[in-house]
Amino acid sequence: MVTLSDRFVGSDLKTSGYPWWAGNARLINLSGKLLGAHVAHAGLIVFWAGAMTLFEVAHFTPEKPLYEQGDILLPHLASLGWGVGPGGEITDITPYFIVGVLHLISSAVLGLGGVYHTLRGPETLEQYSDFFSQDWKDKNQMTNILGFHLIVLGIGASLFVFKAMFFGGLYDPWVPGGGGVRVITNPTLSPSVLFGYLFRSPFGGEGWLIGVNNMEDVVGGHIWVALHCFIGGAWHLITRPFNWARRSLVWSGEAYLSYSLGALSLMGFIASMFVWFNNTVYPSEFYGPTGSEASQAQSFTFLIRDQRLGANIASAQGPTGLGKYLMRSPTGEVIFGGETMRFWDFRGPWLEPLRGPNGLDLDKLNNDVQPWQIRRAAEYMTHAPLASINSVGGVITEPNSVNYVNLRQWLAGSHFILGFFFLIGHLWHAGRARAAAAGFEKGIDRKTEPVLSMSDLD
């Protein structure tokens, strides 16, 4: 029978109360080893990011848009303005290669740190310094840790702002002529504008946070986020929890886990909606069109085609009596006709130049349509996010896109699914933490676990 050395005391069922497959629960009271597990986990995440970036670089095809190549990381890098030319064309993949290599190097450092803290470092950080204490019931120390985390998040938001304002700028799909990289020189700082997004309706053209449609507001929002993170971090480092917080909150490792999972769930749901609906932060040049965008692109493409064949786009009627090409919205705005009228609230960089004060401008549609707008609409029309997340065939209207699944489906679907499971995890661990704090039984009796009645492997 294989025996474990003292090195693994606290890591098995007999010495920790948790079986080996219970993960980090075995390390609740071993802060040093718990740090090692977290650092190693970070190394795995960074390794995936680097390896996947290099994989996408190795398979990159210049003739195809990113959303046709199944890439999920290069679009993020392109949105930051690296290697992108006018119209969202990828002109240089060297920055992507460098980013991938830097992530691989970073993952090696993190991996070594994880191994060190798991095998060689002190089992509890308190042995090294009280500054790194992780006593879950030490309320003052827990708020210190929260403060440091907020400051790190503030640094991350600040780096985004610096990139936008001082280090090359960001890709802006609203640059005239089809999009381009530009430096954001005048970010929005007005609190009434930025915090006004929080009070918008989530429906129709309002779109709550997801309705942001200019890079000035995006960068300005990150400035405010960074400022709040820095102020909040300093506050939690300087102050001690108020009495109401000491009494009302549960102070335990599992409670902190539940709080974190709840926050991740919220961010997952918001990210899902951003990916699915927003074409400013997630440019369609890299991620493919949104559902409403593909629908409007189809109407626009057929309008241009039939107009060139002699159709009167202003008066033609469809089989239902509605305008075949153009009609009026419930508010009187001129919109595309037919089935796509349900998406009349859509706003896109390729379509907005054709609007006037009362909606789509007939004179502009007759005389001012540019070739790049026609090409983009035709491309978006055939790349609608209509397949399922596990589809391999897409939809039948995609003659030039074999096995195509719109990137927005992958990213929005995965973030929504992960957000849902994080929410379940939040509720599960919150219930366990509250039960433990109340002093009654939680979870399942370990005596009933089948694995405990099984024979040894050897």
UniProtKB/Swiss-Prot annotation:
Binding-site positions, [CaMn4O5] cluster: E352
Subcellular location: Cellular thylakoid membrane
Alphabetical list of Gene3D superfamilies matching this protein: photosystem ii from thermosynechococcus elongatus
GO molecular function, a single term: electron transporter, transferring electrons within the cyclic electron transport pathway of photosynthesis activity
Keywords in alphabetical order: Chlorophyll, Chromophore, Manganese, Membrane, Metal-binding, Photosynthesis, Photosystem II, Thylakoid, Transmembrane, Transmembrane helix
Keyword Membrane: yes
Keyword Repeat carried by entry: no
Topology class, membrane: Multi-pass membrane protein
Record-linked InterPro entries: PS_antenna-like, PS_II_antenna-like_sf, PSII_PsbC, PSII_PsbC_sf
Domain of life: Bacteria
Record's subunit section: PSII is composed of 1 copy each of membrane proteins PsbA, PsbB, PsbC, PsbD, PsbE, PsbF, PsbH, PsbI, PsbJ, PsbK, PsbL, PsbM, PsbT, PsbX, PsbY, PsbZ, Psb30/Ycf12, peripheral proteins PsbO, CyanoQ (PsbQ), PsbU, PsbV and a large number of cofactors. It forms dimeric complexes.
Role noted for this protein: One of the components of the core complex of photosystem II (PSII). It binds chlorophyll and helps catalyze the primary light-induced photochemical processes of PSII. PSII is a light-driven water:plastoquinone oxidoreductase, using light energy to abstract electrons from H(2)O, generating O(2) and a proton gradient subsequently used for ATP formation.
Family: Belongs to the PsbB/PsbC family. PsbC subfamily.
Name of the protein in question: Photosystem II CP43 reaction center protein
Organism: Prochlorothrix hollandica
Gene name linked to the record: psbC
